[in-house]
Protein backbone atom coordinates (compact mmCIF):
# COMPACT_ATOMS: atom_id res chain seq x y z
CA UNK A 1 0.00 0.00 0.00
CA UNK A 2 1.23 3.50 -0.80
CA UNK A 3 2.15 5.89 1.98
CA UNK A 4 0.55 9.29 2.48
CA UNK A 5 3.11 11.76 1.12
CA UNK A 6 1.89 14.85 2.98
CA UNK A 7 2.21 13.33 6.48
CA UNK A 8 5.58 12.98 8.22
CA UNK A 9 6.60 10.27 10.71
CA UNK A 10 5.09 12.27 13.58
CA UNK A 11 1.74 12.46 11.78
CA UNK A 12 2.12 16.16 10.97
CA UNK A 13 1.08 17.65 7.66
CA UNK A 14 3.88 19.07 5.53
CA UNK A 15 4.50 20.14 1.95
CA UNK A 16 6.33 17.48 -0.05
CA UNK A 17 9.89 18.34 -1.11
CA UNK A 18 10.00 17.94 -4.90
CA UNK A 19 13.44 19.50 -5.42
CA UNK A 20 15.10 16.19 -6.37
CA UNK A 21 12.37 15.11 -8.78
CA UNK A 22 12.90 15.21 -12.52
CA UNK A 23 10.82 17.58 -14.62
CA UNK A 24 8.42 15.70 -16.86
CA UNK A 25 5.33 16.56 -18.86
CA UNK A 26 2.33 16.04 -16.60
CA UNK A 27 -1.31 16.14 -17.52
CA UNK A 28 -4.60 15.54 -15.72
CA UNK A 29 -8.24 15.51 -16.74
CA UNK A 30 -11.21 15.80 -14.39
CA UNK A 31 -14.97 16.10 -14.66
CA UNK A 32 -17.89 17.48 -12.68
CA UNK A 33 -21.63 17.58 -13.23
CA UNK A 34 -24.34 20.05 -12.28
CA UNK A 35 -27.83 18.54 -12.41
CA UNK A 36 -30.82 20.88 -12.60
CA UNK A 37 -34.40 21.15 -13.81
CA UNK A 38 -34.91 21.12 -17.57
CA UNK A 39 -36.21 24.70 -17.44
CA UNK A 40 -33.00 25.92 -15.80
CA UNK A 41 -30.85 24.11 -18.34
CA UNK A 42 -32.93 25.50 -21.21
CA UNK A 43 -32.41 29.02 -19.86
CA UNK A 44 -28.63 28.45 -19.95
CA UNK A 45 -28.66 26.88 -23.42
CA UNK A 46 -30.90 29.59 -24.88
CA UNK A 47 -28.80 32.40 -23.40
CA UNK A 48 -31.75 33.79 -21.42
CA UNK A 49 -29.92 34.12 -18.10
CA UNK A 50 -30.12 37.67 -16.75
CA UNK A 51 -26.52 37.47 -15.44
CA UNK A 52 -25.09 36.73 -18.88
CA UNK A 53 -23.30 33.79 -20.50
CA UNK A 54 -23.21 31.09 -17.82
CA UNK A 55 -20.79 28.83 -19.71
CA UNK A 56 -18.32 31.63 -20.49
CA UNK A 57 -18.31 32.75 -16.86
CA UNK A 58 -17.89 29.19 -15.55
CA UNK A 59 -15.06 28.56 -18.03
CA UNK A 60 -13.12 31.64 -16.88
CA UNK A 61 -13.77 30.76 -13.22
CA UNK A 62 -12.42 27.24 -13.78
CA UNK A 63 -9.29 28.53 -15.49
CA UNK A 64 -8.68 31.04 -12.69
CA UNK A 65 -9.24 28.32 -10.08
CA UNK A 66 -6.67 26.02 -11.68
CA UNK A 67 -4.13 28.84 -11.56
CA UNK A 68 -4.92 29.51 -7.88
CA UNK A 69 -5.13 25.93 -6.58
CA UNK A 70 -1.95 26.38 -4.53
CA UNK A 71 -3.69 29.27 -2.74
CA UNK A 72 -6.81 27.20 -1.95
CA UNK A 73 -5.37 23.78 -1.04
CA UNK A 74 -2.82 24.25 1.76
CA UNK A 75 -0.16 21.70 0.74
CA UNK A 76 -0.27 22.18 -3.04
CA UNK A 77 2.76 23.66 -4.78
CA UNK A 78 2.42 26.81 -6.90
CA UNK A 79 2.69 25.57 -10.48
CA UNK A 80 3.52 27.13 -13.82
CA UNK A 81 0.67 25.65 -15.82
CA UNK A 82 1.24 25.56 -19.56
CA UNK A 83 -2.36 24.71 -20.47
CA UNK A 84 -5.77 24.82 -18.82
CA UNK A 85 -8.93 23.83 -20.69
CA UNK A 86 -12.45 23.96 -19.30
CA UNK A 87 -15.10 22.47 -21.57
CA UNK A 88 -18.78 22.67 -20.70
CA UNK A 89 -21.48 20.66 -22.41
CA UNK A 90 -25.21 20.71 -21.82
CA UNK A 91 -26.68 17.21 -21.56
CA UNK A 92 -30.43 17.84 -21.89
CA UNK A 93 -31.16 14.10 -21.85
CA UNK A 94 -29.84 14.05 -18.24
CA UNK A 95 -30.85 17.62 -17.23
CA UNK A 96 -27.28 18.48 -16.44
CA UNK A 97 -24.11 20.23 -17.48
CA UNK A 98 -20.92 18.20 -17.83
CA UNK A 99 -17.67 20.00 -17.15
CA UNK A 100 -14.39 18.45 -18.30
CA UNK A 101 -11.05 20.04 -17.50
CA UNK A 102 -7.50 19.48 -18.64
CA UNK A 103 -4.34 20.83 -17.02
CA UNK A 104 -0.80 20.38 -18.33
CA UNK A 105 2.71 21.46 -17.41
CA UNK A 106 6.32 20.42 -17.50
CA UNK A 107 7.32 20.17 -13.88
CA UNK A 108 8.16 18.18 -10.78
CA UNK A 109 4.66 17.55 -9.44
CA UNK A 110 1.33 16.54 -10.88
CA UNK A 111 -1.67 18.64 -11.86
CA UNK A 112 -4.51 16.46 -10.59
CA UNK A 113 -5.55 18.97 -7.95
CA UNK A 114 -5.56 21.78 -10.50
CA UNK A 115 -7.84 19.82 -12.85
CA UNK A 116 -10.18 18.87 -9.98
CA UNK A 117 -10.24 22.43 -8.63
CA UNK A 118 -11.02 23.83 -12.09
CA UNK A 119 -13.94 21.41 -12.51
CA UNK A 120 -15.24 22.09 -9.00
CA UNK A 121 -15.11 25.88 -9.25
CA UNK A 122 -16.70 25.86 -12.71
CA UNK A 123 -19.55 23.79 -11.21
CA UNK A 124 -19.85 26.15 -8.24
CA UNK A 125 -19.99 29.10 -10.63
CA UNK A 126 -22.88 27.54 -12.54
CA UNK A 127 -24.66 27.02 -9.23
CA UNK A 128 -23.97 30.60 -8.15
CA UNK A 129 -25.27 32.06 -11.40
CA UNK A 130 -28.43 29.93 -11.41
CA UNK A 131 -29.35 29.77 -7.71
CA UNK A 132 -31.85 32.62 -8.09
CA UNK A 133 -34.01 30.39 -10.30
CA UNK A 134 -33.21 27.01 -8.71
CA UNK A 135 -31.67 26.33 -5.33
CA UNK A 136 -31.85 22.52 -5.39
CA UNK A 137 -29.32 21.92 -8.17
CA UNK A 138 -26.91 19.07 -7.42
CA UNK A 139 -23.16 19.23 -7.97
CA UNK A 140 -21.42 15.91 -8.46
CA UNK A 141 -19.88 13.61 -8.94
CA UNK A 142 -16.52 15.33 -9.27
CA UNK A 143 -13.70 12.98 -10.18
CA UNK A 144 -10.27 12.57 -11.73
CA UNK A 145 -10.58 11.01 -15.18
CA UNK A 146 -6.91 10.54 -16.04
CA UNK A 147 -3.39 11.60 -15.21
CA UNK A 148 -0.07 11.03 -16.90
CA UNK A 149 3.55 11.72 -16.10
CA UNK A 150 5.52 11.43 -12.92
CA UNK A 151 6.83 8.61 -10.78
CA UNK A 152 3.43 7.14 -9.89
CA UNK A 153 2.69 6.49 -13.56
CA UNK A 154 -0.46 6.88 -15.56
CA UNK A 155 -4.05 6.55 -14.36
CA UNK A 156 -7.25 6.37 -16.33
CA UNK A 157 -10.71 5.82 -14.88
CA UNK A 158 -12.43 2.64 -16.02
CA UNK A 159 -15.06 3.15 -18.71
CA UNK A 160 -18.58 3.70 -17.38
CA UNK A 161 -21.13 0.98 -18.01
From Swiss-Prot:
Effect of residue 21 to A: Loss of activity by 85%
E.C. number: 4.6.1.17
Pfam families reported in the protein's UniProt record: MoaC
Metabolic or biological pathway, per its Swiss-Prot or TrEMBL entry: Cofactor biosynthesis; molybdopterin biosynthesis
GO biological process: Mo-molybdopterin cofactor biosynthetic process
Tree of life domain: Bacteria
Induction comment from the UniProt entry of this chain: By anaerobiosis, repressed by the molybdenum cofactor.
The keyword Lyase is assigned to this record: yes
Residue positions of the active site: 128
Keywords: Lyase, Molybdenum cofactor biosynthesis
GO molecular function, one term: cyclic pyranopterin monophosphate synthase activity
Enzyme class: lyase
Catalytic reaction list: (8S)-3',8-cyclo-7,8-dihydroguanosine 5'-triphosphate = cyclic pyranopterin phosphate + diphosphate
Annotated effect of mutating residue 114 to A: Loss of activity
Binding annotation for substrate: 75-77, 113-114
The keyword Lyase belongs to this UniProt entry's keyword annotation: yes
Quaternary assembly: Homohexamer; trimer of dimers.
Job description of the protein: Catalyzes the conversion of (8S)-3',8-cyclo-7,8-dihydroguanosine 5'-triphosphate to cyclic pyranopterin monophosphate (cPMP).
NCBIfam families named in the record: moaC, PRK09364.1
Similarity comment text for this entry: Belongs to the MoaC family.
Protein's name in the database: Cyclic pyranopterin monophosphate synthase
Organism of derivation: Escherichia coli (strain K12)
Gene name of this polypeptide: moaC
Amino acid sequence: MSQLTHINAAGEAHMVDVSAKAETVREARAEAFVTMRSETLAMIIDGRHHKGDVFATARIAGIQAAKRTWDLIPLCHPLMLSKVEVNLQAEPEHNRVRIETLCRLTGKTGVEMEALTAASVAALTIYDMCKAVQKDMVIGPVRLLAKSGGKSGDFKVEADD
